[in-house]
Amino acid sequence: IANVFAVDIHPAAR
């Protein structure tokens, strides 16, 4: 993950 507010690899990883 690049950023907590960005959907990058895992959309559910936040």
Curated annotation (Swiss-Prot):
Q: State the top-level EC class.
A: transferase
Amino-acid biosynthesis: present as a keyword of the record?
yes
Could you tell me the keywords of this UniProt record?
Acyltransferase, Amino-acid biosynthesis, Transferase
Q: Would the keyword Transferase turn up in this protein's UniProt record?
A: yes
EC numbers on record: 2.3.1.30
Which pathway does UniProt place it in? Amino-acid biosynthesis; L-cysteine biosynthesis; L-cysteine from L-serine: step 1/2
Query: What reaction is this protein's catalytic activity?
Result: L-serine + acetyl-CoA = O-acetyl-L-serine + CoA
- What is the top-level taxon of the source organism? Eukaryota
Q: Name one GO biological process term.
A: cysteine biosynthetic process
Gene Ontology MF term list: serine O-acetyltransferase activity
Q: Which family does it belong to?
A: Belongs to the transferase hexapeptide repeat family.
* Assembly and interaction partners: Homomultimer.
Any idea what this protein is called? Probable serine acetyltransferase
